[in-house]
């Protein structure tokens, strides 16, 4: 798999402390609906997919664990736990599906965290969650934790991505690589510039 080659090559860099799969991140999460048994939308989950390594890299703390994390299950925040009445005796929520299972099966509870950019706020019916992926599923994003000089590490990552792209697809394509902190700063700057223009 091409992403595995990229992940392993990045992980081998001296500037990289850890590299693992993720599909999106807390800043660029997406919305998944929560429905009652009549299929009425009752809430929204702001989600991204991550494995346990990515969760540790992002500083996400597990509060309770109900079962082994497996693909198809989710981690919910303390806020979502309260909103949907989740417990060790009721580790599910959402409408009942045709196979008898519920829309969401919960493997555990994580500490509340902020999703979206620095100014984003969840609506009253929006809650955060992380879908479980395992190293076998892979992902479309490689999350990387660096060490040492940030600019030097970023350049090493970009060079490696370009080199791997050339080896795999024949073209030294640029890949998007940015620190989450920089993404947040740029979002704030963009919002500030927009306010100044208005």
Predicted regions, residues:
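A glycine-biased structural micro-motif
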Residues: 92-94
């Amino acid at each position: 798999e091409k992403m595995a080659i990229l992940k392993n090559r990045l992980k081998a860099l001296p500037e990289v402390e850890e590299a693992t799969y993720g599909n999106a991140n807390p800043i660029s999460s997406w919305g998944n609906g929560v429905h009652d048994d009549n299929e009425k939308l009752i809430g929204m989950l702001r989600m991204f997919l991550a494995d346990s390594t990515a969760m540790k890299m992002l500083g996400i703390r597990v509060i309770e664990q109900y079962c082994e994390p497996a693909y198809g299950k989710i981690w919910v925040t303390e806020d979502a736990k309260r909103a949907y009445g989740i417990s060790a005796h009721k580790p599910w929520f959402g409408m009942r599906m045709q196979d008898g299972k519920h829309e969401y099966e919960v493997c555990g509870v994580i500490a509340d965290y902020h999703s979206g950019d620095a100014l984003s706020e969840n609506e009253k019916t929006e809650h955060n969650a992380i879908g479980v992926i395992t190293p076998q599923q892979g992902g479309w994003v490689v999350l990387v934790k660096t060490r040492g000089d940030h600019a030097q590490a970023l350049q090493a990552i970009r060079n490696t991505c370009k080199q791997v792209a050339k080896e795999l697809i024949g073209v030294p394509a640029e890949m998007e690589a940015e620190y989450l902190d920089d993404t947040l700063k740029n979002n704030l700057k963009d919002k500030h510039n927009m306010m100044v223009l208005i």
